[in-house]
């Protein structure tokens, strides 16, 4: 929904068709967390909600980013109406341009990584961290910040060691 590739009615139709074809499979979709709040009709056909949370893109300072993530999660849980919510993507870039109070840096990326993983472990929230490696191919579309979300760089070197 976020990118506008598909309208909600078509996505709902695809989910319904999948549920008929594979009835024992938990079915849902992945999108930005607020899209599930905006489209309750989409939530109704999902068994599970997979939401992307990026406090960086919303300009949160790294010291407040974990609390911001928790608020995003609560908004999504409310929209999910009892369905399981999995954080499908979250992360922090290590370089690039600031987004309001959000500053990309190796230190900030590690702070966010540690804080979000501690919180998710303590709360029993499933979380996928984005990303394992930098994606240098993204520089054309998203600049330095878009290619710099990895825990390791493009040469498989752990960023915090260098």
Give each language-model segment a name.
Residues 8-19, 69-77, 113-117:
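Generic structural signal for well-ordered alpha-helices
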Residues 49, 87-89, 127:
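Conserved, mostly hydrophobic/aromatic
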Residues 54-98:
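Glycoside hydrolase catalytic-domain groove-lining segments
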Residues 1-6, 37, 87:
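Active-site groove signature of glycoside hydrolases
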Residues 31-68:
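Aromatic- and acid-rich polysaccharide-binding/catalytic face
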Residues 20, 40-45, 78-81, 121:
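Acidic (Asp/Glu)-rich catalytic clusters
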Residues 98-106, 119-162:
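Aromatic-rich peripheral "rim/lid" segments of glycoside hydrolase catalytic domains that contact
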Residues 19-29, 82-85:
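Short beta-strand/loop segments at the ligand-binding rim of alpha/beta enzyme cores
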């Amino acid at each position: 929904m976020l990118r506008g590739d598909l309208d909600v009615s078509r996505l709902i139709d695809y989910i319904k068709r999948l549920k008929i074809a594979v009835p024992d499979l938990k079915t849902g979709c992945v999108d930005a967390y607020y899209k599930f709040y905006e489209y309750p009709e989409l939530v109704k056909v999902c068994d599970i909600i997979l939401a992307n949370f990026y406090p960086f893109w919303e300009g949160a300072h790294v010291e407040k980013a974990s609390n911001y993530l928790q608020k995003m999660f609560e908004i999504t849980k409310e929209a999910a109406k009892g369905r399981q919510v999995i954080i499908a993507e979250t992360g922090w870039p290590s370089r690039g341009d600031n987004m309001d109070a959000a500053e990309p840096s190796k230190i900030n990326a590690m702070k966010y990584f540690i804080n979000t993983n501690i919180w998710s472990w303590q709360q029993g929230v499933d979380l996928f961290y984005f990303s394992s490696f930098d994606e240098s191919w993204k520089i054309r579309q998203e600049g330095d910040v878009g290619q710099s979300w990895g825990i390791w760089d493009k040469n498989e070197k752990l960023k915090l060691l260098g």
